[in-house]
Amino acid sequence: MFKHETVLLHETVDMLEVKPDGIYVDATLGGAGHSEYLLNKLNEQGHLFAFDQDQTAIDNAKIKLAEYSDRVTFIKSNFRYMKEALNERGIEAVDGILYDLGVSSPQLDERERGFSYHQDAALDMRMDQEQELTAKKVVNEWSYQDLIRIFFQYGEEKFSKQIAREIERRREVKPIETTGELVDIIKTAIPAPARRKGGHPGKRTFQAIRIAVNDELGAVEDSLENALTLLKPGGRISVITFHSLEDRITKYLFQEATKGPDLPPGLPVIPDEYKPDFKLATRKPIVPSEEELEQNNRARSAKLRVIEKIIK
């Protein structure tokens, strides 16, 4: 069964200031924890559109949310196509959108999905099991320079060159097939003193490959830009990020959206059309409480940012 600890459950949904008859989007259905809590706040006129590119997540959510089946629509799609998918269903604007950008724990924990550096499995890492690009293709077919780039940019890995060089050396002998082989390569490439510090040596490289396989950062940027155009006045977007790369994108897009145009200083009144369309609902990101961290260690790096479309 699809078990998933929902992070910042109440904060994320409560910050949307849910209207019982509103239209809402869960961009990252996952274990459906946020969806369930949100649906509980909707009446029969309200509706939730829930996106996930993983059919297993949708199948499990249909069971979990069966009592709300009349007010939820499941859409199997990457959230970067949210706007088109909603427009196709006659939805031009919504009251709120939430994102939980963590990889849902069941995907990490299912050995055959190939996300985990703790379990030996085929190199896969696809969120969408129908797409062609896999971790195996990245590791065996991408150039030395491209591997360095993703390890450094997406994994912030100090030993990117050494790991890419060792991958190149091994794959000339035979294709790299499994997560276990990749972990062995990483351990060989990273100097022993560094291996003993800062958690599992494979963590950063595996994160980088997962982001590359699923084009996660490109999808986040595309989706958030579209989400801002979908909001009704007074509507809000809640975004939970788990690492600095996604948080940087979210923070930048939200800051840009809340800026007005450059106007000469000292204007007595700023016309409405020059005022920004959005405001930050939280000056600083909301982080999990000590109590939540005790119950769910995966929440440690979570940050929640919220933006609101201004009613003019």
UniProtKB/Swiss-Prot annotation:
It is an enzyme of class 2 (transferase). Gene3D superfamilies: Putative methyltransferase TM0872, insert domain, Vaccinia Virus protein VP39. GO terms for biological process: rRNA base methylation. SUPFAM superfamilies: Putative methyltransferase TM0872, insert domain, S-adenosyl-L-methionine-dependent methyltransferases. The keyword ATP-binding does not apply. Signal peptide: none annotated. Keywords: Cytoplasm, Methyltransferase, rRNA processing, S-adenosyl-L-methionine, Transferase. Its main location: cytoplasm. It is found in: Cytoplasm. S-adenosyl-L-methionine binds at A32, G33, H34, D52, F79, D100, Q107. GO terms for molecular function: rRNA (cytosine-N4-)-methyltransferase activity. Its EC number is 2.1.1.199. It comes from the Bacteria. One of its GO terms (cellular component) is cytoplasm. It catalyses: cytidine(1402) in 16S rRNA + S-adenosyl-L-methionine = N(4)-methylcytidine(1402) in 16S rRNA + S-adenosyl-L-homocysteine + H(+). PANTHER family: 12S RRNA N4-METHYLCYTIDINE METHYLTRANSFERASE, S-ADENOSYL-METHYLTRANSFERASE MRAW. NCBIfam families: 16S rRNA (cytosine(1402)-N(4))-methyltransferase RsmH. Belongs to the methyltransferase superfamily. RsmH family. Specifically methylates the N4 position of cytidine in position 1402 (C1402) of 16S rRNA. This is Ribosomal RNA small subunit methyltransferase H. It comes from Listeria innocua serovar 6a (strain ATCC BAA-680 / CLIP 11262).
